[in-house]
Design a protein with these regions (language model features):
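Blade-terminus and WD-like Trp-Asp/Gly-His loop motifs, strongest in beta-propeller folds
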Residues: 37-48, 87-97, 129-138, 183-191
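Residue-level marker for isolated small/hydroxyl-bearing positions within beta-strands
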Residues: 50, 98, 141-142, 195
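Conserved blade-ending motifs and adjacent loop-strand segments that build the rim/top face
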Residues: 80-85, 117-130, 159-184
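Blade-level signature of beta-propeller repeat domains, shared across WD40, Kelch, NHL, RCC1
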Residues: 179-212
Length: 212
């Protein structure tokens, strides 16, 4: 954890702690680990992340294990429920992610799925990138199909939704230079920012304007 104003750094979790937690959970071999998809929850009290190992051709057993930890480094918890894609926090200690082709809400205290958002016919491939609006009433999910990215904007209060046109991402569909959907809300919840390729092949930022 880094204090932006002062630059003060605090180690919340060590790789040794993660290794010990994985071994205690039954992993006989723990390869070199790295941390991915680190997310603060909305009140700043809890952090969600994945401990990963054995990826991208590196030696050792493949590991993809979610954890949570409090913002002061206490209560490191191996999460036994798994939600895929790039997770997002809902309210409190509940996270949003993909499971069994559904966009679900996962309670990190109960360690179980407690709700579902929309229907798979509306939000396809929920293992992509999702972003919740500041007021929690809207969610946007981006996903890829056939080399193209598209986004679904869904209003949770009444189920209204819209899907954007397809944006061609070829040849940047996979690999380190891939064009991920990665939507982001502005602070007042009126616009959504996403990266995408344009007709001339350059990578630009795009904005979805919500008229509500």
């Amino acid at each position: 954890r880094v204090n932006i104003a002062s630059g003060e750094k605090t180690v919340l979790v060590s790789f040794a702690q993660l290794r010990d937690a994985l071994i205690a959970d039954g992993h006989s071999e723990v390869s070199a680990l790295f941390i991915n998809h680190t997310l603060w929850n909305r009140d700043g009290g809890r952090i969600y992340f994945y401990a990963r190992g054995g990826w991208d051709g590196n030696k050792g057993a493949r590991i993809n294990q979610p954890f949570t930890v409090n913002a002061d480094g206490s209560d490191l918890t191996l999460q036994r429920g798994f939600i895929g894609g790039h997770p997002e926090w809902e309210m409190g200690h509940r996270a949003i992610g993909g499971q069994d082709d559904k966009l679900v809400i996962y309670d990190t205290d109960l360690q179980e799925v407690v709700d579902q958002i929309a229907d798979p016919t509306i939000i396809e491939k929920p293992g992509g990138d999702s972003s919740l609006s500041p007021d929690g009433n809207w969610i946007v999910t981006g996903y890829g199909k056939g080399g193209h990215n598209m986004w679904v904007v869904y209003r949770r209060t009444d189920g209204a939704w819209i899907r954007t046109p397809e944006y061609d991402q070829r040849p940047y569909v996979s690999g380190d230079l891939r064009s991920d959907p990665a939507p982001l809300w502005n602070r007042d919840g009126s616009k959504i920012l996403f990266p995408s390729l344009t007709a001339d092949g350059s990578r630009q930022l795009h904005i979805i304007h919500l008229n509500i």
